[in-house]
């Protein structure tokens, strides 16, 4: 089997990097500027209403994870009645998606992103990812790309992977590479 010389010139490497990593420039070290997703936090005031809302939200998440979607949605609503919080809307959107109620989920994600402030980067990141997935499902790739770019800038690895998947140049390059490797076999 012939061996291919896979040494790339710096220019070729930069072209491939710009295709496969659209948010990173190989000539710049942007990785240090983008936080890791695990470092993202939500900071909220420590009021009684928010504490009670958070407790209901956690119970709703547990119900949702166990498949009790209707009960979870009721608890999310009770949580929102105590305090309008972006995190609750984001998590309720996830449950609505599981219940195949995508339009309602999209409404909640829009509201979550309106409510989220600069101290709620985790919720913002997750809401952008979820909304990007919904837009992608609806074939609105431009809106999906915008949400994935916002989430990637906040540190989401998932969003960066989605950007590569919806990048037409990356798809074309993958196809060409697949053909080249098939010819080498």
Curated annotation (Swiss-Prot):
Its family remark reads: Belongs to the TTC36 family.
Which organism is this entry from? Answer: Drosophila melanogaster
Q: Which domain of life is it from?
A: Eukaryota
Each TPR repeat, start to end:
53-86, 88-119, 125-158
Q: Name one Pfam family in it.
A: TPR_8
Record SUPFAM superfamilies: TPR-like
Name the UniProt record assigns to this protein = Tetratricopeptide repeat protein 36 homolog
Q: What does the entry give for GO biological process?
A: tyrosine metabolic process
Keywords from the named record: Repeat, TPR repeat
What InterPro entries does UniProt report for this protein, alphabetically?
A: TPR-like_helical_dom_sf, TPR_rpt, TTC36
Q: Could you read off the lineage of the organism from its UniProt record? A: Eukaryota, Metazoa, Ecdysozoa, Arthropoda, Hexapoda
């Amino acid at each position: 089997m012939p061996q291919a010389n896979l040494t790339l010139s710096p220019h070729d490497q930069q072209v491939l990097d710009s295709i496969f990593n659209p948010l990173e420039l190989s000539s710049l070290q942007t990785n240090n500027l983008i936080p890791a997703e695990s470092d993202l936090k939500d900071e909220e005031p420590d009021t009684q209403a928010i504490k009670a809302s958070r407790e209901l939200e956690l119970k709703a998440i547990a119900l949702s994870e166990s498949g009790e979607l209707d009960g979870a949605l009721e608890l999310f609503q009770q949580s929102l009645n105590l305090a309008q919080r972006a995190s609750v809307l984001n998590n309720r959107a996830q449950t609505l998606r599981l219940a195949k109620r995508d339009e309602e989920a999209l409404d909640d994600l829009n509201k979550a992103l309106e409510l989220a402030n600069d101290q709620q980067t985790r919720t913002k990141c997750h809401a952008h990812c979820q909304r990007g997935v919904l837009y992608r499902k609806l074939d609105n790739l431009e809106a999906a790309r915008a949400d994935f770019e916002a989430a990637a800038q906040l540190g989401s690895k998932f969003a960066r992977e989605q950007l590569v998947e919806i990048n037409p140049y990356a798809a074309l390059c993958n196809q060409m590479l697949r053909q080249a490797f098939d010819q080498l076999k």
